[in-house]
Amino acid sequence: MNKIYIILLTVFFYANVYSQQAYFVDGYHGGIYGHYPVKWKTQFIVDQLAMHPDWRICMEIEPETWDTVRVQTPEAYLRFKEMATSDQVEFTNPTYAQPYCYNISGESIIRQFQYGIAKINKHFPGVDFVTYSVEEPCFTSCLPQILKQFGFKYAVLKCPNTCWGGYTAAYGGELVNWVGPDGTAILTVPRYACEKLEPGSTWQTTAWGNSDAYLKDCRNAGIKHPVGMCFQDAGWKNGPWLGSGKNTKNNSIYMTWRDYIENVSIGKTDDNWYFSQEDIHVNLMWGSQVLQKIAQEVRVSENRIVMAEKMSVMAYLENKYICRQADMDEAWRTLMLAQHHDSWIVPYNGLHRKGTWADQIKRWTDSTNHLADGIIKASMRSLMKSLFRKIMLNSNIYVFLIH
């Protein structure tokens, strides 16, 4: 009799354990600069979405990519445009060039979102941006404030399949309130405290494939709605990452992050995580000469373009000078491209058969500097004209100190 009770208890235990539903967020990461085979990829995506109506994807594609897709594969572009606002698709990282964020200026991060959102909405007007989620460790402590200002409601601090550039500290359970240094909080799916690095690996966490071990750790940690994640490289020819239909691994349900957070997760939490820069465990080749050179080039351009904006504003206030918006936009565009995450992690890799990433960064920042210098000179000429007029009229003269 005791044996029967033991057997029944064992069966009940395992039935209860495996009855807990698992969820998974799939998607694509890349772009025209960071892997996106234009000739077939968009058609492949729309075909897979049509073939698997229960599949959901999050899109982290460089916004400029869609300019090329529209020209080279117009039919696939139009089909995806129809699907872009469906329940199957969520855009989760609209930044122009997917920067790491922790190694560039705050103003640059703001412009990455500003220009990226504008470009995506130009192609897909109905798309909104609710959840920030990335495949690379594109995080920084001040993001909650910036995300909230751009209308985001949620964030995700996982990057399970691409940790070679770094990963966030393991903390918390199903949800946390990510609190930035200014006190702004955003509801966030963290890299769970139980979400370990894969054995013998520093480039994957256990959340990348909803394995039995990962789901067991989640259950033991009290996570009611465990979720895994993998944004596939856009160069890979894979559809649903965990399989489809009855063959989906561990009966996982595909979700977008928005759908998961709003309709599946516990929805709110009292766990406030005061996330700092030290919680981003980065893994770049700091100290190498090429990375020092890239950092210097990017920082010079960041300072130069902000100086150009300040000068043009002063010239406008003094003399109604307006710089050419196309010049300012292009100056920001080339700087944003120089801030691409691949600039920092693979600087010696080739890019479009035009030398290495490091070579291209030099060209991009040189272009930004040239345009910014032109705006500064034009602003100074406008200010000088106003100064001479005031001298002739014996008016008050103001001295501008530029830092």
What is each of the regions a protein language model found here?
Residues 20-403:
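Catalytic-domain carbohydrate-binding cleft regions of carbohydrate-active enzymes
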